[in-house]
Amino acid sequence: MKDIKSYETETKSIGSGQVLSCAYSCEKAKLVLKEMINELVLDLFEKMVMTDQIVLTVEYDTENLKSNYKGEISTDMYGRKIPKHAHGTRNLEEWSASGKKIMKAGLSLYDEIVDPVLSIRKLYVTANHIISNTKAEEKKQYQQISMFDLIQAENEGQEKVDIKRDDIREKNLQKAELEIKKRFGKNAIMRGISLEKGATAKERNDQIGGHKA
């Protein structure tokens, strides 16, 4: 299993790619994608940047050609024939590093572009148009909420305040998770999905340069 990460300042993108150890079903690969998105969101938070576009690429396993596959065929980097990969983008309503918003965008895009019948071998997810939190907030004229703002909820509209409150809660959780991982290791705290069968985060965290430590 290989894990590829990149932070491209010139193209303003942050992404990761994973080569699965074996062919995964659509649902099983979706679990891995959730883990990858969680890691991507934490990476955005750590770098203090936001994105307004999620890009997803899914490559299918060559074994699919032995079934009754009738779709387009392409060639992988090893010269093998494989079903044409699935690729798509999803724009967010505004610049964000919100796990909820990015997860929703990534999973809806996955459901839209992936053929559920085909087995999957590679996943790539990228956050595009990366800008600093400061620039993002300037662009969307975002103002940090204070306790006074919460008390004056009736003046701003309860729904708007609830959204801001959720954002603050999520950022606090991200900060706590990041601090724990830095202090005790990436496997010190794991999300529930990473304990399910087929999840790969724990194994990838145990690896250094693609090999187990």
Which residues does each predicted region cover?
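Basic, low-complexity intrinsically disordered segments
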Residues: M1-A213
